[in-house]
Amino acid sequence: FDKLAQAGAELLVQTLPFIFDGTATREKQPEESPTPYAAMISKKMGLLDFRKNAEELERLVRGLDPWPSAFTFINGKTLKVWKSSVLEKQAQEAPGTVIAADKGGIQVACGQKVLVLHEVQLEGKKRMEADAFLRGYQLKPGDMFRDSRE
C-alpha cells in the first residue's frame, strides 16, 4: 500500500501542471462491451439451493452477509446461514440432506461436494455457532433442509 501511495503521489505531481494549464491529453475509454449492470438484490436471492455446487453456495453465503443473508428452511422454520465452508468430498445423500451435525458444523449434501454450516440463526433466535445451535436444536443425519416452509 505504501509503494502504491508513493507512486500515486509522484504521478499526481507530474500530471497536475498539465491539467491546470489545459494541455493534458484525454483518452477515450474502450467500449469493447456494454457496461455490465448487476440485478437488484432481493431477499429471495438468499435461498440456498442445495442442488448447486457447495462452492457456489459458500460464495453466496459470504456475498449476502449482512443483507439479505443466505437462508434455508428446516421443519417449517427459516434458518439463516452466516458462515460456511466447503468440504471436498462428494455426498451420496440427496441434496439438502444433513450428513453430520457436530461441533465441527452441520454438513449438508449438495449437488457437488458438501457445504458445512458454521454459524446460523433460527428465526426468532440470535446468531450462533453451529455447535451452540445443535445443543438446543436436535439435527441428525438424514434430516432435510427445504426450499420452502412446507
Segments from the language model and where they lie:
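Conserved anion/nucleotide-ligand pocket segment
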Residues: F1-A24
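Charged, low-complexity, helix/coiled-coil-prone segments
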Residues: F1-A7, M40, N75-K83
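Generic alpha-helical structural context detector
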Residues: D2, Q14-P17, A39, R59-R62, ...
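Hydrophobic alpha-helical segments and helix-packing faces
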Residues: A5-G8, P30, F50
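Anionic-ligand binding region
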Residues: R26-I41, G46-L48, V61
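An anion-binding loop in the catalytic cleft
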Residues: M45, F50-E150
